From Swiss-Prot:
Its EC number is 2.7.1.71. Belongs to the shikimate kinase family. AroL subfamily. NCBIfam families: PRK03731.1. Gene3D superfamilies: P-loop containing nucleotide triphosphate hydrolases. This is Shikimate kinase 2.
Amino acid sequence: MSLPIYLIGARGCGKTTVGQALALALGYDFCDTDHYLQQARQQTVADIVAIEGWAGFRAREAESLKAVTAASKVIATGGGMVLAEENRLYMREHGRVIYLNANALVLAARLEAYPLADQRPTLTGRPVAEEMVEVLAARDALYQLAAHHIIDAMQTPDAVVNQIVSSLSLARAS
């Protein structure tokens, strides 16, 4: 049985894009926890946050993580999935965790170009570049703590996929 692969990292690091390509390369299924949650609740992330607040959203996010976990699956998680220790431990115990690491300026540029940005409420209400600096400062240590592998996500999606496949192969060989 092949363990699930969890992709973690800040918004805009490429978890969904890389995850879909990685799943294809490995012959795995793909799931995005935010998309799963939105389909299950028939609400956008922004709607869930508006109705239940961030704490309610984080609780639903944790439920989604457990619901989608299965063997031979690549799972793109929400950027804040690592905030709860329960989620970090769950991912480490049930699969391989890959941190897609990118700097704040790259993330901000990607988010500003992303057409569905209105579905992702800002955490601080400030411009996206400022927010990404603050979010990364607060979360980078948590991403590193949760990760089995840290991958440079400032490359092309294909290069990121190749680096992940190599890292996973090296881990299996050791």
